[in-house]
């Protein structure tokens, strides 16, 4: 599902909300979540899951085209851990 499809579904289910209001709410929520992760905060949405950063250590990779070894720096990557309610609902 894309962001546009999500907006359409919410507008369809919640007839009193306009598409612009829903779009603004979703964009604002995603921006706030991105900013929180960028500053190292953990985001927890009860019943859904949590977002955090995991550190990937520096390593030696390989360019698949040339086979040449490449040094890759360590970096933080976003990580999502689903909550129990979400896991249960998906496995129904």
UniProtKB/Swiss-Prot annotation:
PANTHER family: DNA-BINDING PROTEIN HU, INTEGRATION HOST FACTOR SUBUNIT BETA
Gene Ontology biological process terms from the UniProt entry: DNA recombination; regulation of DNA-templated transcription; regulation of translation
The protein's assembly and partners: Heterodimer of an alpha and a beta chain.
Family to which this protein belongs: Belongs to the bacterial histone-like protein family.
Gene: ihfB
NCBIfam families: hip, PRK00199.1
PROSITE patterns, sorted: HISTONE_LIKE
Domain of life from the UniProt record: Bacteria
UniProt keywords, alphabetically: DNA recombination, DNA-binding, Transcription, Transcription regulation, Translation regulation
Name of the protein described by the UniProt record: Integration host factor subunit beta
Function: This protein is one of the two subunits of integration host factor, a specific DNA-binding protein that functions in genetic recombination as well as in transcriptional and translational control.
GO molecular function: DNA binding; structural constituent of chromatin
A Gene Ontology cellular-component term: cytosol
Keyword Transcription regulation among record annotations: yes
InterPro entries: Hist_DNA-bd (IPR000119), Histone-like_DNA-bd_CS (IPR020816), IHF-like_DNA-bd_dom_sf (IPR010992), IHF_beta (IPR005685)
Keyword Calcium: no
